[in-house]
């Protein structure tokens, strides 16, 4: 019997294991030289001015919003078609999330929809680079500049993504994730990249108790006057155990993303005969990181609902995922915004299915998934 094929699995090898062992043997396992290495490498590779490692992208989003002064009475525009953590952070800061619709085929936010949602209370715009593709930053930056509203890019899916001739994170402010299923991982972790000196300084303070320096700096500098609380902050620093994994993964990113791209090309060929609807690619020049490979399962076309198809895949030993259930359709937000209607988001939320995609997949795994989908859809279309 074939083993279960998960929808994701981290590409952890001997280099990462040895890096962790070296940290454990070094005597310094919390925030230290590996964090510094990760931040330095990230800036060198992607051209960012500042890189601040944190314990998760959610933590990075929280303190970035806080650093921008977001609070009660403010509004933040963002899509509902995203992971719920962004909107949770807006609400927990006492601000109001203004959820907008996305393009039906790419899941990217529409610049016109964002501009239409701007009010005098709008204090930030958070677009999402979805599944590894970038949103249209030129249009969004023009809106940001025209209205004087900060743009914070949710780049959790976009490590190694390019928009036109720029890396995501090279310009502006972007927040990355190193969660277990991301293109590079350290189990849990994230990073804030920004070209804003003042914002970078405040994010760095807020991630570690509001101190002007982190633990590693304090050891080097002793009990210097600067090692004092400048403002109340959080404990969102990343340990060197985690950072060491991320340093190795970042070095391996080109091979990791190249393998993802090859697997997706195989998927497109293998699934071409099926009535599944993969996401469309943005029309502008870009480099896709292929964090996720998603299809839309429309019952009228496929003879089976998304949820039924996912259950059938599971019965056949194949994992799948849902990225994501629209935020405004979930209990807390559904009750808070009962009249919010986002047609494209809702259509996709009911049909999205993420198929297995990770660097260590075999070519035969793609064939296995395609054969399973062919069997499932074939049997249901016949019986309908």
UniProtKB/Swiss-Prot annotation:
CDD domains reported in the protein's UniProt record: AHBA_syn
Keyword annotations? Aminotransferase, Antibiotic resistance, Lipid A biosynthesis, Lipid biosynthesis, Lipid metabolism, Lipopolysaccharide biosynthesis, Pyridoxal phosphate, Transferase
List, alphabetically, the Gene3D superfamilies matched.
Aspartate Aminotransferase, domain 1 (3.90.1150.10), Type I PLP-dependent aspartate aminotransferase-like (Major domain) (3.40.640.10)
Entry's InterPro entries? ArnB_NH2Trfase (IPR022850), DegT/StrS_aminotransferase (IPR000653), PyrdxlP-dep_Trfase (IPR015424), PyrdxlP-dep_Trfase_major (IPR015421), PyrdxlP-dep_Trfase_small (IPR015422)
GO CC annotation, single: membrane
**Residues modified to N6-(pyridoxal phosphate)lysine:** 182
Which co-factors does it depend on? Answer: pyridoxal 5'-phosphate
GO terms assigned for molecular function: pyridoxal phosphate binding; transaminase activity; UDP-4-amino-4-deoxy-L-arabinose aminotransferase
Q: Where is the signal peptide?
A: none
The metabolic or biological pathway listed in the UniProt record of this protein is: Nucleotide-sugar biosynthesis; UDP-4-deoxy-4-formamido-beta-L-arabinose biosynthesis; UDP-4-deoxy-4-formamido-beta-L-arabinose from UDP-alpha-D-glucuronate: step 2/3; Bacterial outer membrane biogenesis; lipopolysaccharide biosynthesis
Q: Which reaction does it catalyse?
A: UDP-4-amino-4-deoxy-beta-L-arabinose + 2-oxoglutarate = UDP-beta-L-threo-pentopyranos-4-ulose + L-glutamate
EC number(s) of the enzyme? Answer: 2.6.1.87
What are its GO biological-process terms?
lipid A biosynthetic process; lipopolysaccharide biosynthetic process; polysaccharide biosynthetic process; response to antibiotic
The family line of this record is: Belongs to the DegT/DnrJ/EryC1 family. ArnB subfamily.
The protein's job, in short, is: Catalyzes the conversion of UDP-4-keto-arabinose (UDP-Ara4O) to UDP-4-amino-4-deoxy-L-arabinose (UDP-L-Ara4N). The modified arabinose is attached to lipid A and is required for resistance to polymyxin and cationic antimicrobial peptides.
Description of how the protein assembles with itself and partners: Homodimer.
In Swiss-Prot or TrEMBL terms, this protein is called: UDP-4-amino-4-deoxy-L-arabinose--oxoglutarate aminotransferase
Q: What is the lineage of its organism?
A: Bacteria, Pseudomonadati, Pseudomonadota, Gammaproteobacteria, Enterobacterales
């Amino acid at each position: 019997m074939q083993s279960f094929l998960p929808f994701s699995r981290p590409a952890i090898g001997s280099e990462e294991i040895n890096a962790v062992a070296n940290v454990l043997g070094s005597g310094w396992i919390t925030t230290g030289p590996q964090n510094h290495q990760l931040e330095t490498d990230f800036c060198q590779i992607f051209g960012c001015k500042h890189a601040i490692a944190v314990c998760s992208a959610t933590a990075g989003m929280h303190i970035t919003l806080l650093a921008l002064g977001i609070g009660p009475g403010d509004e933040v525009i963002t899509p509902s078609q995203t992971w719920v953590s962004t909107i949770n952070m807006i609400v927990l800061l006492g601000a109001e999330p203004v959820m907008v619709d996305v393009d039906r085929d790419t899941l990217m936010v529409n610049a016109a929809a964002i501009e239409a949602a701007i009010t005098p209370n709008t204090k930030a715009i958070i677009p999402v680079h979805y599944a590894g593709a970038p949103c249209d930053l030129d249009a969004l930056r023009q809106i940001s500049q025209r209205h004087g509203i900060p743009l914070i890019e949710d780049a959790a899916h976009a490590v190694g993504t390019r928009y036109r001739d720029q890396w995501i994170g090279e310009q502006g402010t972007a927040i990355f994730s190193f969660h277990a299923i991301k293109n590079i991982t350290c189990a849990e972790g994230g990073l804030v990249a920004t070209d804003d000196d003042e914002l970078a300084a405040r994010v760095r303070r807020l991630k570690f108790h509001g101190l002007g320096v982190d633990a590693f700096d304090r050891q080097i500098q002793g009990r210097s006057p600067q090692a004092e609380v400048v403002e109340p902050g959080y404990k969102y620093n990343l340990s060197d155990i985690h950072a060491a994994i991320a340093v190795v993964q970042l070095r391996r990113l080109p091979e990791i993303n190249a393998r993802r791209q090859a697997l997706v090309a195989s998927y497109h060929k293998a699934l071409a005969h099926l009535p599944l609807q993969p996401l469309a690619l943005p029309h502008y020049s870009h480099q896709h990181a292929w964090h996720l490979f998603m299809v839309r399962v429309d019952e009228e076309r496929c003879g089976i609902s998304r949820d039924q198809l996912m259950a059938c895949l599971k019965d056949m030993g194949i994992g799948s995922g849902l990225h994501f259930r629209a935020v405004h359709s979930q209990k807390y937000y559904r009750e808070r915004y009962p009249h919010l209607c986002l047609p494209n988001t809702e259509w996709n939320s009911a049909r999205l299915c993420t198929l297995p995609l990770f660097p260590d997949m075999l070519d035969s795994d793609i064939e296995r998934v395609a054969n399973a989908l062919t069997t499932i859809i074939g049997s249901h279309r016949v019986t309908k």
